[in-house]
Amino acid sequence: MGMFSFIKEAGQKLFGHKEIENAAAAAASDASAQANLDQLNAAAAKGIATYIESQNLGVSALSVSFDGATGAVTVEGQAPTQDASEKVALCCGNVGGVQSVNNLLAVSEPADESEYHDVVSGDTLSKIAKEYYGDASKYPVIFEANKPMLSHPDKIYPGQKLRIPAEA
């Protein structure tokens, strides 16, 4: 799937990304600080992997790494569908402190990729559906495409990236 950009300050608060950023700055000139950074990166990657697994997307051989200096996540493994692969990328990227996701998941059932939308202040799923599909009443398509990460159609926030599937 490739590389996706995200808004670093938006998203789930799974780990202390400011602490990791400070450790990354210190690690440039200090070996013990580098060891601390490695531990923080591993803990962040584990938190992201646990979040992905909690979504029950059917991914096997999941491997997640995080680089606190750049805010980059790399995710590898086997996804059963294109939808699952895209949802994993969103699980990784819609986390505070993550700026980019390199999605290297292999997909068992490849399909066309979805479009993506960055939520801005004032957006609603109805407004987004009107923009992409020409019909505000098609917001459930977007909601379903972003479940289980979205628990309710009204629980979107500025900076969040959403999947916009092709119109069925």
Tell me what each language-model feature is.
Residues 36, 40, 80, 117-120, ...:
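Extracytoplasmic/periplasmic, Sec-exported soluble proteins
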Residues 91, 95-112, 140-168:
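Extracellular LysM carbohydrate-binding repeats and other cell-envelope/extracellular binding modules
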Residues 69-74, 79, 108-136, 140:
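Primarily a LysM-type cell-wall glycan-binding module
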Residues 5-11, 131, 161-165:
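Serine/threonine-biased, Pro/acidic-interspersed low-complexity stretches characteristic
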